[in-house]
Regions:
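Short, hinge-like loop/turn segments at secondary-structure boundaries
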Residues: 63-64, 94-95, 178-181
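Catalytic pocket of metal/acid-base enzymes, prominently hydrolases
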Residues: 1-78, 102-154
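Conserved helix-loop functional segments at active or binding sites
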Residues: 152, 175-183
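Active-site-proximal loop/turn and secondary-structure-junction residues that shape catalytic pockets
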Residues: 50-53, 80-84, 166-168, 197-198
C-alpha cells in the first residue's frame, strides 16, 4: 500500500489506465456527460488541462468522437497542459493542438500551467509560518520552470492559465505575471488563476 499525489498520477496510471480508460467505460462516461449537460441547459463546457492522461491527439480524438455530432447541443472548449506530454515536444504539440478547432470541439491559444499542489492534500505551498506540522507542500512546476514555460507561451500570444493554491504559490505566480508584463506588455492578456485555495 502507499499514497500517491499530484504528479504521482503518472506512476499510478500505468496500472490504473486499462481499467479507467477501458473503451466501453469511457464511452459510457462521455455519454453521461452529454446527458447531464443537456439536462442542465449547458451551452459550453470546458476541460482545463487536456493531454495529461492519454496525450493531446488521443484525448482530442475521443472527445470529437463523442461530441462532434448532431446529438450534442453544447460546445466543448479544451485547454492543453504540458504536464503529461513528452519533454521537449510539449510546445510543438500544444501549438499544433491550438489550430485544431471544429464547430463543437474548440481549441485555441490557451495553456494551463501548474504552480503548487492541491489544498485538499495539503500540497499547496505556504509562506511562513506554513503548515503546523512543518511539511512544505509541493511544487507542481518549480518556480523557474513555471517562469520559463509561461514566458514561452506568453511571448507567443497564448492566454496563460495557472493552477495555484497556497500563498507562496500565489506569490510566485503573481511575480511571473509581473515579470511577463514588464518584459512584454499585453493589455488584454487574461492571465487566469485557477483554484486559489488560500
Amino acid at each position: 500500500t502507499g499514497v500517491f499525489s499530484e504528479r504521482g498520477i503518472k506512476a499510478a496510471l500505468a496500472g490504473l489506465a486499462p481499467y479507467i480508460f477501458e473503451p466501453e467505460r469511457l464511452a459510457y462516461g462521455l455519454e453521461r456527460l452529454r446527458e447531464i449537460a443537456h439536462r442542465g441547459g449547458i451551452t459550453t463546457i470546458g476541460d482545463m488541462g487536456i493531454g495529461g492522461y492519454l496525450g493531446l491527439d488521443r484525448e482530442l480524438e475521443l472527445l470529437r468522437g463523442a461530441f462532434e455530432n448532431d446529438a450534442t447541443s453544447f460546445r466543448l472548449f479544451l485547454v492543453s497542459s504540458p504536464w503529461g506530454l513528452p519533454a521537449g515536444m510539449d510546445q510543438k504539440l500544444i501549438r499544433d493542438f491550438a489550430t485544431r478547432s471544429t464547430s463543437r470541439v474548440r481549441t485555441g491559444k490557451h495553456v494551463k500551467l501548474l504552480a503548487d499542489g492541491g489544498f485538499f492534500a495539503q500540497n499547496m505551498r505556504m509562506n511562513f509560518p506554513g503548515y503546523t506540522d512543518g511539511h512544505q507542500g509541493k511544487w507542481m512546476m518549480e518556480p523557474d520552470e513555471l517562469m520559463s514555460a509561461a514566458r514561452s507561451y506568453w511571448n507567443d500570444g497564448y492566454q496563460v492559465h495557472v493552477h495555484v493554491n497556497g500563498d507562496e504559490g500565489m506569490d510566485v505566480t503573481l511575480n511571473v505575471l509581473a515579470t511577463l508584463l514588464e518584459e512584454q506588455p499585453r493589455p488584454d492578456h487574461r492571465f487566469t488563476l485557477h483554484h486559489v485555495g488560500y
